[in-house]
Every structure is written in structure tokens, then in C-alpha cells.
Amino acid sequence: MDVWSGCMKGSVFVVLLVFYVVTGRLLSKEAVAHVLGIDNLPANRMCLTTDEYLHGMISLVNELPRLSMYLVIKGNYNAPERIASNVNQIHSTFKELNLKNDSLRKRFDSIKYDVKRLEEILYDLTLRGLLGTSGSDCPDLVPVTDAAFSEQFYTRLC
């Protein structure tokens, strides 16, 4: 089953990213497996391992500073604060895990650089007096314009 591990990590990342962009929330391992349609498969056929889920979560965290910068460019100055809070919570949770010196540990170490990038974004916004100045017309995250996609995505989760 290791032959699919790289694809599974990428798929987990995509599901986590899309759900985060649409809702601003994270998905559990079980919810990701449900979205991917592998929650009811026998374990000997295909399953989502904790390692694959954690790799996908780290990939999400690595992408969030970019999303934060994009939202600032679009005029949403409040979202980076929420994103930074989520990343800090994820980082704290990963610190509690006893990770061995393997690829997951090396990827976990990259989170501290993402935390730093988000802190720099918040620092810049604070210096410019922009933190907390988003108008009510600015979306929380990136708006999804395709209602059919959004409805299918939510239906798949339930």
C-alpha cells in the first residue's frame, strides 16, 4: 500500500485546503477519509493512515502563509490573524507528539518557519495600522463562486 502513500498525502492536503478555504475550519482524519470515499473500504484494500493525514496537515500549514498574503493583497486584513491562530494551535499540537527522526519530524520542523512568516505578516499589518480594519464587504476567506461545487462538497461531508 506504500505505493499510494504519496498520492494519498497529496489528496489529503487538497481536501484539507479546500475545506479550510471554504469554511475556515479543519477536518478530522475520519472526515477526510469520508470525503475521499475510502472510509467504508476494508483496511486491506485502502485506508488513510495517521502518517498520511499528518503529512497532509503539514502541507496545509505550509500553504497557509501564502493564503494569508493573498488575502492581505485582496484587502482582507483580519483573516491572517485567524490563520495565524490556527497555525499556532496546530504547531502546539504537533509539539505534543513524540515524533521520531523521520520524514514527518523533518516536515514538522518546517512549521516553525510558517509561524514566523505569519508573525511577520501580522507585524506588518500592525505597523501599518491595518489589523482589524477590514470592511464588512471583505470575505473571511476566499469566496467560492461555484455554488454547485460548494453544495456537493458539503453534501459529501455529511
Segments the model singles out, each with a brief description of its role:
Residues 33, 76-85, 132-140:
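Long amphipathic alpha-helical coiled-coil segments
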Residues 1, 25, 44-47, 53-56, ...:
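Non-catalytic, interaction-prone regions of core transcription and DNA-replication machinery
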Residues 82, 101-102:
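Short, well-ordered alpha-helical segments
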Residues 102-158:
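C-terminal accessory extensions/subdomains outside the catalytic/core fold
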Residues 1-40:
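Long, charged all-alpha helical bundle/coiled-coil segments in cytosolic proteins
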Residues 11-22, 58, 65-72, 91-98, ...:
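A structural signal for well-ordered alpha-helices, especially hydrophobic packing surfaces
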Residues 42-83, 87-90, 94:
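Surface-exposed interaction/gating patches
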